[in-house]
Amino acid sequence: MKRVVITGMGIYSCIGRNQEEVKESLFQGKAGIGIAPARKEMGYFSALTGLVERPDLKKLLDRKKRHSLAEQGEYAYMATLEAFRQARIEEKFLLENEVGILYGNDSSAAPVIQAIDIIREKKNTALVGSGSIFQSMNSTITMNLSVIFHLKGINFTISGACASGSHAIGMAYLLIKSGLQDCILCGGAQEVNPYSVGSFDGLGAFSAREDEPEKASRPFDKNRDGLVPSG
């Protein structure tokens, strides 16, 4: 059985856009939680959410590749860039070796809803656009990143609610340990928008501490009142 090592890591989240920013946020106790006014407009009981800045990919990817990326794919792309950079994995290595990709992703609701809205309003499926299908599939991250980074190894998406990313890392470990793969890009990414979590809000699953956004997520507190969606 092979030993398995982590050679690089990348993070793009509500508490930082890279490892250094996340480290500083952890040292300073920054939660990255805030209020999303759009959720209140949609009738949400709780507008609390992790505030994740959408990356500007215009200088990093051509329009065709950007057009196929859903929101969570953008986050995953940025994290992957950092991970490969730390691991010193360049394009030449990716082209010459069989590198796999396993990503946890639980939904891609926004592109689906946006496409359906167009069809209902315009009565014309052609107006949905060519990129919609690649954004809508639950495999949107692994499908897009495998093309962008020339990944030719194992390729599938794992969906297991909040544990999706952890499952992906565990599965990558097992595949490398058993000798079935030599190198795998793995992790998790999730969309952060009102469409994907409306049902949770309706169930009363979210914290209602809108007056204390930074202190709302307190899973081990005896006075906890719910979770906070984030990414």
Predicted features and spans:
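ACP-dependent fatty acid/polyketide chain-elongation machinery
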Residues: 1-65
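Residue-level preference for short coil/turn positions at secondary-structure junctions
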Residues: 2, 95-97
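Conserved beta-strand elements of the Class I
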Residues: 5, 100-102, 182-185
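Structured loops at beta-to-helix junctions and adjacent beta-edge loops in soluble globular domains
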Residues: 9, 104-106
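Acyl-thioester C-C bond-transforming condensing/cleaving domain
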Residues: 17-20, 30-36, 85-95, 106-231
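A glycine- and small-residue-enriched flexible loop/hinge segment at structural boundaries
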Residues: 38-89, 93, 103, 138-152
